[in-house]
Curated annotation (Swiss-Prot):
Function, in words: NDH shuttles electrons from NAD(P)H:plastoquinone, via FMN and iron-sulfur (Fe-S) centers, to quinones in the photosynthetic chain and possibly in a chloroplast respiratory chain. The immediate electron acceptor for the enzyme in this species is believed to be plastoquinone. Couples the redox reaction to proton translocation, and thus conserves the redox energy in a proton gradient.
Full protein name: NAD(P)H-quinone oxidoreductase subunit 3, chloroplastic
Disulfide bonds: none
UniProt keyword Translocase present: yes
Gene transcribed to yield this protein: ndhC
Uppermost EC category: translocase
Catalytic activity: a plastoquinone + NADH + (n+1) H(+)(in) = a plastoquinol + NAD(+) + n H(+)(out); a plastoquinone + NADPH + (n+1) H(+)(in) = a plastoquinol + NADP(+) + n H(+)(out)
UniProt lineage: Eukaryota, Viridiplantae, Streptophyta, Embryophyta, Tracheophyta
Annotated transmembrane regions: 10-30, 64-84, 89-109
Length: 120
């Protein structure tokens, strides 16, 4: 019941997906000309001269939505391998995943009741 060989294609995909951006940045770093100056340090606004300060402070409600999104996005990452090997793992893995999802639902209800998801 060793499930690691079933994920050979996943590991190959992960390796390729990691190497492509690393190689792109490496090639860019090697081939691109290096020039520093005041023009490089200014903010760029679609070809228009920048007006005002480029730093904008976001409201806290954006961070709360982002945090809840990340939590449930990570949940999907954990549930996907479980769903792929559901038949081999049996009822004990189903109960463990159910407990995991219930804990996340309880966290969502808590955030909802505390008003973390309220926009106004």
């Amino acid at each position: 019941m060793f499930l690691l060989p079933k994920y050979d294609s996943f590991w190959l995909f992960l390796l390729i997906a990691s190497l492509i951006p690393v190689s792109a940045f490496s090639i860019s770093k090697i081939l691109a000309p290096v020039s520093q100056g005041p023009e490089k340090l200014t903010s760029y606004e679609s070809g228009i001269e920048p007006m005002g300060d480029a730093w904008i402070q976001f409201q806290i409600r954006y961070y709360m939505f982002a945090l809840v999104f990340v939590i449930f996005d990570v949940e999907t990452v954990f549930l996907y391998p479980w769903a792929m090997s559901f038949k081999e793992l049996g009822i004990s893995a189903f109960i463990e995943a159910l407990i995991f999802v219930l804990i996340l639902i309880i966290g969502l209800i808590y955030a909802w009741r505390k008003g973390a998801l309220e926009w106004s």
